[in-house]
From Swiss-Prot:
SUPFAM superfamilies in alphabetical order: alpha/beta-Hydrolases (SSF53474), Galactose-binding domain-like (SSF49785), X-Prolyl dipeptidyl aminopeptidase PepX, N-terminal domain (SSF81761)
One Gene Ontology term of the molecular function aspect: dipeptidyl-peptidase activity
Subcellular location: Cytoplasm
One Pfam family in the UniProt entry: PepX_C
Descriptive protein name: Xaa-Pro dipeptidyl-peptidase
Taxonomic lineage from the root: Bacteria, Bacillati, Bacillota, Bacilli, Lactobacillales
Organism, as annotated: Streptococcus agalactiae serotype III (strain NEM316)
NCBIfam families: PRK05371.1-4 (NF003783)
Organism domain of life: Bacteria
Amino acid sequence: MRYNQFSYIPTKPNEAFEELKGLGFPLNKKNSDKANLEAFLRHSFLNQTDTDYALSLLIVDAKTDALTFFKSNSDLTLENLQWIYLQLLGFVPFVDFKDPKAFLQDINFPVSYDNIFQSLHHLLACRGKSGNTLIDQLVADGLLHADNHYHFFNGKSLATFNTNQLIREVVYVEISLDTMSSGEHDLVKVNIIRPTTEHTIPTMMTASPYHQGINDPAADQKTYQMEGALAVKQPKHIQVDTKPFKEEVKHPSKLPISPATESFTHIDSYSLNDYFLSRGFANIYVSGVGTAGSTGFMTSGDYQQIQSFKAVIDWLNGKVTAFTSHKRDKQVKADWSNGLVATTGKSYLGTMSTGLATTGVEGLKVIIAEAAISTWYDYYRENGLVCSPGGYPGEDLDVLTELTYSRNLLAGDYIKNNDCYQALLNEQSKAIDRQSGDYNQYWHDRNYLTHVNNVKSRVVYTHGLQDWNVKPRHVYKVFNALPQTIKKHLFLHQGQHVYMHNWQSIDFRESMNALLSQELLGIDNHFQLEEVIWQDNTTEQTWQVLDAFGGNHQEQIGLGDSKKLIDNHYDKEAFDTYCKDFNVFKNDLFKGNNKTNQITINLPLKKNYLLNGQCKLHLRVKTSDKKAILSAQILDYGPKKRFKDTPTIKFLNSLDNGKNFAREALRELPFTKDHYRVISKGVLNLQNRTDLLTIEAIEPEQWFDIEFSLQPSIYQLSKGDNLRIILYTTDFEHTIRDNASYSITVDLSQSYLTIPTNQGN
């Protein structure tokens, strides 16, 4: 374990003393540090009346137990504090450590010892070995009662709301859209979980089209074959129009007011929401139009879908109507809500957070968007090509519609509405235009970057630099396009398409607690969070602070002095093997074992580089045909320690999200010896070589120059590292698998790579 603490708010000695006293610790400024430490320890033994015995189980040095020490006349030393602090945080002497000073240095322990009250205060805010902060562990053990009132420590809300007395209710929010032309405004089902309290409370909202169920068989049947011919496109310039977001018309309802009349017993929850539920935040889960319990069509990513989530925030602020049932005869008021909302969730869920933020909806104070899509074209297409998300060849937006249109899982809904749904789905399948892979109005209507200037909320993004599902370009684009007037924060980790709130190496939960206590509960805690926090790829459990995602300087590296050819065609056996399992293709590609058609360029580095942003390939090429795919990957190649991309369990169910509530595993990315690491990649239709909206003809055997931007990353490279560039045509994981007989020739003497860095790095 190594500490990377971003959540602690520096506290003065007097303030620390008052907070400790407020928690019930019997401290006294007139007493010695030794006496105050003993009082602190005895009060911490919440489940033991025999505190002498508890003290006797702690040690203050390699030979003395704490009870003996406190009965002696020995002075308190720094070494004594170090031994005790480590034990309070769950580290075991003679097992986890023998030399506390060296061990504390190794784990980057953040606590100082200048003042006993400041020191104990900071200690309480530190995570233990199990992942829980000491204060959270003590509250769970009974330091404070679950009295359904707010209590704070170091600017963060504590788990003092009773999760055994939760209110679970369902309401149906009306939106001013009729997405299936039914003659009525659509209704959106909202599942609410909230503590029983006299306070008006803020809301953690997860907008999840998955939460009311998914239709895997329908999606599997809709999934496309990737084998086919790459189209030769007619030259043209694509025209699109940005449509203003339409604010819905709001009419106060005159219906009688009623409490919610529908309840539920269980819904799959997001554990970060659970963490805040025990701290006085309501949790709501909304699946939006076209899902089970709601009405309407699954419009998949456009602002109609976004509006179905926005209406829920408007209801929390008293602006639109929610009904007790589909009868629409009684309305429900959100009289428990303070109107302030934070959205949460990963992937599609985080995507809806971004879309919501771009509406500028009142009441949305914070989005915590993890691995979020910023424009749907970049999820299912790339540079004029159909480009499946990593791991899901053949998926497309209409496949996702089939997966998430959960109304068809309700038989009565199916027989009434499936014909209309199928007609709308067919229209969607035509609009996505798999034949050309081009950008069009349909995709433009699902591009949140066009409305990013409307964002008013505070923004938190997390993204994996090994996420080839929702690729890093999504967060790179939106984060750098956000208005300068807002506060924004970005956590970039070395994993794939995963959550990071339950990792051992970073206090993400506690940082979000400080931020949301500030923004949603109005606590003036002076919390400041850095803009870009990046997981260092060279060292285990180490996070660094950077000024920006994207460097201000370009380093140029030549690619060679010869001309090399890439053949697209494979014999039938090889082609069928790669189509059957794209992982076999990737393995052969990365090994460079002459089984795949590729150009491999090894670039031994002559100095250190902190790669920060989008690498670009500047290539002089010619093709033998009027069509061609060019794919590229950049690898850090050669044996050394690197991160795996999926976190593994450190301790099972050790993370407590309240008082023994919604426990989950503590995780971390393994750091092990490996042969290579993909840094970046990309694919390009050579007919889209100038920009996305320009289609150009290819003249066979005529040289032309291209600039090819790859996926952005932040990656530390060292002198002597081998940077491997692989150029090839068909990517069997991502692109159309066209086995046509064409080739691409690259003039390496006229080609080079640019690496984005910070000036002086």
